[in-house]
């Protein structure tokens, strides 16, 4: 397990029609905690956030590549691979990426995806632009697999 610094609790809850309650963060570093016992959607926004899952289905959703960059990524806590999901479909759509290439080495070309697992922390890295930092998310205490990630959402 990684050592986790304490961040202030933040975000604003909304209740979209026909969707689970959604907690949206700001561009500040903050801790967003899902509702216990019911489905929740957590959207961190900018800054290196901590998104905390609770009992019940949680969706950790990303809309822009700047929501979690490789030089200061978000950390997901209490991720349950049997019912939770990381949704990066908005990041890919925002960057006009229509195909991905999952590989073992670092991402080189736009659309390349790398999943690593070291010392109890998994990291998802996606090359979203030719230059600049990659989109990146750390998942504490879970061996992250491609089936835990929604790359292309069908709406």
Range-by-range predicted roles:
Residues 102-106:
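An exposed tryptophan-centered "aromatic clamp" motif
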Residues 20-24, 28-101:
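Acidic, glycine-rich calcium-binding repeat modules characteristic of RTX/beta-roll
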Residues 1-12, 20-21, 108-155:
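Low-complexity acidic/polar repeat-biased segments
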């Amino acid at each position: 397990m990684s050592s986790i610094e304490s961040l202030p609790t933040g975000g604003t809850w909304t209740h979209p029609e026909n969707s689970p309650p959604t907690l949206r963060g700001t561009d500040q570093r903050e801790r967003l905690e899902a509702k216990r016992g019911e489905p929740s959607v957590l959207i961190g926004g900018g800054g290196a956030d901590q998104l905390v899952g609770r009992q019940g289905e949680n969706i950790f959703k990303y809309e822009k590549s700047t929501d979690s960059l490789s030089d200061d990524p978000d950390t997901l806590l209490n991720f349950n691979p049997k019912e939770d999901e990381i949704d990066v479909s908005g990041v890919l759509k925002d960057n006009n990426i229509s195909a991905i290439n999952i590989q073992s080495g670092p991402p080189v070309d736009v659309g390349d995806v790398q999943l690593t697992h070291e010392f109890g922390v998994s990291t998802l890295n996606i090359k979203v632009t030719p230059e600049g930092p990659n989109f990146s998310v750390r998942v504490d205490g879970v061996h992250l697999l491609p089936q835990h990630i929604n790359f292309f959402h069908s709406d």
